[in-house]
Amino acid sequence: MRSRSVASLGVLLAIVFYIFTYGFSTYRKNDTSAVKTWLEEHSIPYGSRSSPSDFQQFISESYDSLVPNLDKWSGHNLNSWLGKKTESSYLDAISNKIRKTGRKLSGSVEDARDATQEAWESQKASLFESWSDSQLRAFLARHSPQFAAKEKKGILEKLSPASLRETAAKEYDALTSKLGNTGDWIYDTWSDNELRTWLHDVGVPISSHESTRSHLLRKLKNYISTKADEAQPSVEAVKGKASEKAKQAGEFVSDKAGDAKELVNEKSSEAGQYAGQKMEEGGELLQEISKRRGRFGNWWANSGLKAYFDAHGIPAYQPSPIDQFYAHLRRQYYLKTNGYQALKSKAYEEASNVADSASSIASNVASGATEAYQGAASGASRFTEGAKTAAESVTSAFEHNKDTATSKAKQMKGKAASLGSTASEKVGEAADYAAETASKVASKAASKVRETIDETIIERWQDSKLKEFLFLRGVPVPQRSTKDQLLDLVRKHFNKGAVPNWAAYFDTLSSKELSAWIKEYKKHYHGKLHPSKDREHLFQNACNIYRAIAEKADKSVLQSIQSKFPKATVPGYDSWSNEDLKSALKEYGDSIGKVFNRKDAIERLKRHDILFYGPVVADKAKSGVSGFLRRVASFMGFGTRDVAEIKLGENIQKVKDTASKASSAVSSAGDYVETNVKKAQRVL
């Protein structure tokens, strides 16, 4: 309540200031109605006065009594007068007058705007009144994006005539901004016969030499332009009516605003300018419609159609070799941007087949080795039984025929040696075949994977990463090499060699672990280390120290270091800090978002590692052929095939175990025979 009283007092003081500053000079220029209104609202009797001169004389004579001389008033009189002028009823009355005046002004402006908008909508809707339903459907199917799809064209058949016209009028707004206000595209769905029929229906004569489409369109445009010109007076009348309403609203405000006249006049002026601006814009738009001057099918240029046909593989006439060349370029660009997914899917399928083939071959090799082992074991068992029987025969025949016993013992010994040699050869051949086949399959799988993705990934690698790739494979790198030269070398040696396990070991370590390793072994290195503490340079320092140790240091130190290498596969990244991960991604040329996702970063690094490492030179299954195939399978997206890759590793190990068992069985059989032969010889 207190804030309201203060605000009201401020309004009242502004009114008093206005009266003291300008006096009644404004009302001396106005008509008597304004003076009467002011006197009545302030409860000042004016008697029978009616003419302007009477009121001017009355105001001049009574000026001192009407305008209080506050300087001469006592404090009591001032408080009394201000109390009356700050009563809530008095202030509410002033506020109500201002609100009513504002509403009337707003209503007048809205009426003017609505009248202009109605005239425009009526003019726009009349454009499609004479169209048939089929013409409207063809127009919308051709130009409206919401009905462009084949499955949505059936919706047009269900729309009523009124809905078709309403939809066409709405689409017209969007199309005019896109294709131009008055282009011939509006009628490009009409046939020549439909144009003639329409002109005939509206009474436009067509002579025999005006039968071409260009003549028909010109006739149609002239007719519409004439009708638009005839409607121009109506548009001007609407504008005049709106202006008159705005003027009347301004006069009404001038009559009713009272002491707030200055404020309301300002609002009236702003609203009048806004209304005038909108009416002017509406008039200009209607004027544009009346011109009806547009283009003749320029939107469907031959070059645009050819470009569309070329990109989508549609045969189009190419008059010259250079046109054929550009058509080929457009086709290749489309395949690169839109056909890449199909090509990549095909590569995935091929890599999947390679993995299946690897598993099948290894399984067959293992089966063959198992059969060889079983044959060797069975033969050894039979030979053992035969050896026992023969030994008994030798002992019993000792008294009868000494020479015969000696001959049989020699035969048994020769047979055991022959059987052991044959079994060992078969098992060895099976194991060698399994290892050779698995190596070929792994190489083929690696080649297929890399052929699929090297062009899209390695080009993002930094120069330092490309040099490291070549360095770890023993490929000499020129001192000054450009990015293109490095890429050529990487592509050339992509499927050659493998990363040594000591390099793989260092790449599994975080920057903290690398720093600790360097601190422990740098005493064996007398060269200069890079001072930077980022992971890239720490890795280079560790490699330099290891090579120095391998060349000169004590063998016990080297063996201690190398004992950890067979455990190295590829980086697991679990112990790496976020800064290490970001540094590694930066080396691979991957972007790092504002919000760092650790899990996503690790996945991206593992995908790059498939290309960078390949099969790591080590004896463990995880870092050898089987591990590489599993990582390839995971990267290519067919994780369900992991069982096949695991089985491949198991089958290879089974071949090795089978060879060991077969050799052991044959050796045992040979030892048994040898023992019994010696016993027989001692007896003899």
Curated annotation (Swiss-Prot):
GO terms for cellular component: endoplasmic reticulum; nuclear envelope; nuclear membrane; plasma membrane. This is Stress response protein ish1. Has a role in maintaining cell viability during stationary phase induced by stress response. Activated by the spc1 MAPK pathway. Homodimer, and heterodimer with bis1. Signal peptide: none annotated. Keywords: Membrane, Nucleus. The gene is ish1. Its main location: nucleus. It is found in: Nucleus membrane.
